[in-house]
Amino acid sequence: MLPVVPVFNAVNALKEKTYLYLSSQLVLDGKDMTKDDILEFVQNSHGQNISVLLKDAKFEDDDLIVLLNNGVVTLFIDSDDYAAHLVEIGVPSIRLTLLKDGAYQFSFGQIQEIQQSQLVKASEISLETFTNSVLSGMKTDRPDGLYTTLVVDENERSLGLVYSNKESVSLAIETQTGIYFSRSRNEIWRKGATSGNVQKLLSIELDCDGDALKFVVRQGGSGSFCHLETESCFGNFRHGLYGLQKLLQERLLNAPEGSYTKRLFNDSDLLTAKIKEEAEELTEAVDKKDIAWECADLFYFAMARLVANGVSLEDVERNLNTKHLKITRRKGDAKPKFLKKEPVAVHEEDGKIVLNVVSASDKAAVEKAVTRPIQKTAEIMNLVNPIIENVIKNGDKALVELTAKFDGVQLETPVLEAPYPEEYLDGLTDELRDALDLSIENVKKFHAAQMQSETLDVETQPGVVCSRFPRPIEKVGLYIPGGTAILPSTALMLGVPAQVAGCKEIVFASPPRKSDGRVSPEVVYVASKVGASKIVLAGGAQAIAAMAYGTESVPKVDKILGPGNQFVTAAKMYVQNDTQALCSIDMPAGPSEVLVICDEEADVDFVASDLLSQAEHGIDSQVILVGVSLSDSKIEALQNAVHEQAMQLPRVDIVRKCIAHSSIILCDSYEEAFKMSNQYAPEHLILQISNAEDYVKDVDHAGSIFVGAYTPESCGDYSSGTNHTLPTYGYARQYSGVNTATFQKFITSQVVTPVGLEHIGHAVMSVAKVEGLDAHRNAVKIRMSKLGLLPSGFE
């Protein structure tokens, strides 16, 4: 522990003084920070021991338990009575740092007395005072005045024994890199200055006597610490888990085609199956040798899954450390499916996936069936606002940091510029390329037909001609959700109409994949086809903020379009109301939804497939079937079809949860069915009824209609030509789906001749006079007077 212990009173204080990251012990002032502030600080820390000072703080007992269960190491308290109370409610005494005789007795992990004078507000600790504090705690009895320094990596593996002097320590703190003193050259040794193996300094610690330093570093370059090009001065590390991680990380980037490891990374289903297989074999192994062998196999495949998803052993250990700190734990029972049970008779209906059935006459039941999930806007905005402010303030730097935090990808630049490198199209098959080309062609054809390019001219009075003409929105930002999903359809549904409308700059934004830091080749292909100038490699609220306000490499756009999760939606709503952004959006958004109207003649397999194609989107999707005069046998057949098809789907667990809160609403007439549909205003409306086309005229509110038995929603989602970016959550009552006009604005103009002024001038002056706007009135009066159109003495 260092001689000075920084005390923080704000979430972002550590970012302002990054050299304080070098302290392994941090204290948060509980009187100035809320529980949520502390949890956020812990979440953003870099592995330091974090304690909370409770002097003058007011926390409920439950709040303190939450803090101790989520990364807070100890509580600094002044009262023996309060300490006794905390022990009584279950806090281990080792987690309490109690004030005795003017010093806090710290005993978690190491025994240490912390004098009250050592607790210094972070705001008062400059780089100079922090450095001087470290130097003041160092001791040496060596004749050359050097300090023995043990260098370890972030996994506490010893890299080597070196020496430091006060100058090298000062430089190391200032630059936050590994800098030592070379005895052989008698000079400052900047590690990696010639070899490129630069070290990032993570923390500095003094041993219990203050006569030895420990530098915790992240080794860069080739990973070699020793001049003999080995990982440490004691040779290379044993392979172990960290060696396996390093090997798999290299294989992820360079594994030859056809290799088993390459196959594992490219086939997530195979990797999942192997993990389950090896876990089962481990449970069946009996002797020590077999158990060790099977466990090693399981570790290999588990590590492959970690690497494939950008998760490190450091991430796993961080979770283990947090679990170790928990003082209240789960019961620990296994999930029921993993417990041995006596066989029980399984009834045919057990676990069946069925929709609720309600009558349209039961108003309370109908209201419950059509109620959409509540969106907690205020709570989401509290999380989104700091992200937006960070991007506004720090630009590209914030984008890179937030992408690393939320997407697990460390980028060098947050933007991919056109023309896009050919390697970004690797993996795009000819079959999919043809499918995308067909979809783009159809969407372009339909949206080009919508294009309003001619000027509308109307002579409202003799000599008064009013005109209206379109102009493309100059710069548009198109958000394409990504990460584990591949959504080229969204890219083309937004990009094609923007291209048709003639937008001068089209910017895509999509989060990069954890596996390689790229967006999918399908999205890159669409971006090149529609002329997108760049792809912002970011997702969530940070991507929306970057496009709305602009950064060093992301141009500010005039309108943002595209679907996303609740954070994306909240960010879009924020920027459209911020005059600093001057940015509009396409529409508000909620979970995806479908309403199907069917009758006795409908094919139950078709109806079931339409319901399930929506249910697989997510557990909060809305699936409603409105049945017109359905028989009991028809309802049963529908339920059976839903269950049978659902059980064949890979996302059956999601479907099951969605269908559990989905309903069949029984109506007695088509009129009643369409009245219910119009009240709900669905995103997707599917008509599986006789003479379906005759009923389109009865639809007042819907995002898009799918007419007839052979028109599944999927066609509109991908290739028919209509747009699949549609209003949800009932906004179809006020909004249209994305169309060509979405990317246009319309300007009006008027030309008034002297003849025209004679016809409308008196009306203009009369209205202006009533409104008390004399300057408005004079603008007409002066002109008419000079034209001799006013009678003598006109006032």
Curated annotation (Swiss-Prot):
Residues 309-795 are annotated as: Histidinol dehydrogenase. Its EC number is 3.5.4.19, 3.6.1.31, 1.1.1.23. Its cofactor is Zn(2+). Binds 1 zinc ion. Coiled coil: none annotated. It catalyses: 1-(5-phospho-beta-D-ribosyl)-5'-AMP + H2O = 1-(5-phospho-beta-D-ribosyl)-5-[(5-phospho-beta-D-ribosylamino)methylideneamino]imidazole-4-carboxamide; 1-(5-phospho-beta-D-ribosyl)-ATP + H2O = 1-(5-phospho-beta-D-ribosyl)-5'-AMP + diphosphate + H(+); L-histidinol + 2 NAD(+) + H2O = L-histidine + 2 NADH + 3 H(+). GO terms for cellular component: cytosol. Zn(2+) binds at residues 614, 617, 717, 776. Residues 1-225 are annotated as: Phosphoribosyl-AMP cyclohydrolase. The keyword NAD applies. GO terms for molecular function: ATP binding; histidinol dehydrogenase activity; metal ion binding; NAD binding; phosphoribosyl-AMP cyclohydrolase activity; phosphoribosyl-ATP diphosphatase activity. It comes from the Eukaryota. One of its GO terms (biological process) is L-histidine biosynthetic process. The keyword tRNA-binding does not apply. PROSITE patterns: HISOL_DEHYDROGENASE. The active site is at residues 683-684. Pathway: Amino-acid biosynthesis; L-histidine biosynthesis; L-histidine from 5-phospho-alpha-D-ribose 1-diphosphate: step 2/9; Amino-acid biosynthesis; L-histidine biosynthesis; L-histidine from 5-phospho-alpha-D-ribose 1-diphosphate: step 3/9; Amino-acid biosynthesis; L-histidine biosynthesis; L-histidine from 5-phospho-alpha-D-ribose 1-diphosphate: step 9/9. This is Histidine biosynthesis trifunctional protein. It comes from Kluyveromyces lactis (strain ATCC 8585 / CBS 2359 / DSM 70799 / NBRC 1267 / NRRL Y-1140 / WM37) (Yeast).
